Regions:
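Conserved alpha-helix/loop element of class I SAM-dependent methyltransferases that forms part
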Residues: 29-32, 38-59, 74
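Core SAM-dependent methyltransferase catalytic element
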Residues: 214, 220-242
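Hydrophobic beta-strand segment of the Class I
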Residues: 30, 129-130
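C-terminal alpha-helical "lid/dimerization" subdomain adjacent to the S-adenosyl-L-methionine
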Residues: 17-18, 88, 161, 165-216, ...
Length: 242
């Protein structure tokens, strides 16, 4: 389902290449725009992930679709000794590397270019794996999740933060109006890539959230699966283990 929506409808490139191009294009103002369009709530959601993982005391964490490194940097507070932030977009990673350096976290966090559907790591490599606002951008969702399951250690924790669609009135109607009209308009004003924020809202609307995503995780082989709706259902935090 998530494969049907691509950033650039006129492009002949595959979804993966288009997503890489899109995030390279918007990397310069991505952080600021995220704070604006989410009213700062994305920061609170990430703090919940950090609090959850801190209780698990992982030594190693892989943050997939790390972007500019917000979650990877925040997870330094978990006490993890080794955090790898992986992303398709060199442009996003360049911003992230500067943020890591500004926090003096170069010895803890490594930022690497990589593909979530072909992870450059051995089996059972990480105590925890996270993806924030990234799984809906996978070209092949199940293949990406299979790779995550492969490199996660037995007993390790997998945490996903992803947008979802509210089901209750009036939040459902308000969400549709905001994502269809307001979010793309904000993107048009502040981003040089007019298609990017339209894609981000469209991809969120078709992503298999809630129980549908739980079922996919179960199919892949994850256990202990839970999803926790956030802020009236506009996002969800999914937790699972191997």
């Amino acid at each position: 389902m998530s494969e049907k929506v691509k950033p650039y409808k006129e492009s002949e490139l595959g979804k993966k290449e288009q997503v890489k191009q899109m995030f390279d294009n918007i990397s310069g103002n991505y952080d600021g725009l995220n704070r604006v369009i989410s009213f700062g709530t994305d920061v609170k959601w990430r703090k919940k992930i950090v609090a959850f993982l801190k209780e698990k005391s992982p030594d190693s964490i892989l943050d997939i679709a790390t972007g500019t490194g917000d979650l990877a940097i925040a997870m330094a507070n978990t006490g993890a000794k080794n955090i790898v932030g992986l992303d398709l977009s060199p442009g996003m990673l360049e911003v992230g590397k500067k943020k890591v350096a500004n926090k003096n976290l170069q010895n803890t966090i490594e930022m690497v270019v990589g593909d979530s559907e072909n992870l450059p790591f051995e089996d059972n490599s990480f105590d925890a794996i996270t993806v924030a606002f990234g799984v809906r951008n996978f070209e092949n969702l199940e293949k990406g999740l299979e790779e995550i399951h492969r490199v996660l250690r037995p007993g390790g924790n997998f945490v996903v933060l992803e947008t979802s669609v509210p089901t209750r009135t009036p939040f459902k109607q308000g969400y549709k109006i905001y994502t269809k009209y307001v979010l793309p308009s904000i993107g048009n004003l502040f981003s040089k890539d007019r298609s990017a924020y339209k894609y981000l809202s469209e991809s969120a609307s078709v992503f298999p959230h809630g129980q549908a995503f739980n079922n996919i995780l179960k199919k892949i082989g994850f256990i202990g699966i839970e999803n926790k709706p956030q802020t009236m259902g506009v996002a969800s935090i999914y937790v699972a283990s191997k």
